[in-house]
Amino acid sequence: MRKIILASGSPRRKELLELASVPFEIVVSEVEETIGAYSSPSDIVMSLALQKASAVAENNSDHIVLGADTIVTYESRILGKPSNEDEAKEMLQLLSGKTHEVYTGVAIIAKEKTVTFYERTEVTFWELTEEEIDTYVASKEPLDKAGSYGIQGKGSIFVQNIQGDYYSVVGLPIARLVRELKQFDIDVTHA
């Protein structure tokens, strides 16, 4: 029987697959992520998700491989994971009191076909004080997250409004993924 392999070490993606009762194994993609000249954030996340999944699929061609990538954008500026605490603070100051977009791309690779898709979610932050930002960054939570915040953690208190898929902001649009997996004869809704 074919296995589902998650090409990611993200604990959040692992938790979401477990939440949906999707049986899977983890093989972390060691691919060097490269962003070419893409026209849109959706193209970027789908390309990065495909790069990750393709790298793992090379050695797992009999299985179904999932790759995913998430970025945050604000006024056409891409906000990935911060490289240090100062950059995290800058990102949070930029997002304070404003609406930004979160894009998560997913790639599903199997022998018979490859499917890519993305979800776009708008997130609005409350106005943040310098003290709130400093305290949050000192917690280290934002340092491994696109846009420097975790909506499922302490960063949740910054969110005033969300339009779209909450789980996509966490890192994996799980409801859409479950539906897309049906194309590969995987139906966890009847498990």
From Swiss-Prot:
GO molecular function, one term: UTP diphosphatase activity
S-S bonds: none
Broad class of enzyme this protein falls into: hydrolase
Site residues (Important for substrate specificity), renumbered to this chain: R12, T70, Q152
A GO CC term assigned to this protein in UniProt: cytoplasm
Key word Cytoplasm present: yes
Active site: D69 (proton acceptor)
Pfam families assigned to the protein according to its UniProt record, in alphabetical order: Maf
EC number, as in UniProt: 3.6.1.9
Protein name: dTTP/UTP pyrophosphatase
Species assigned in the record: Bacillus cereus (strain B4264)
Native organism taxonomy: Bacteria, Bacillati, Bacillota, Bacilli, Bacillales
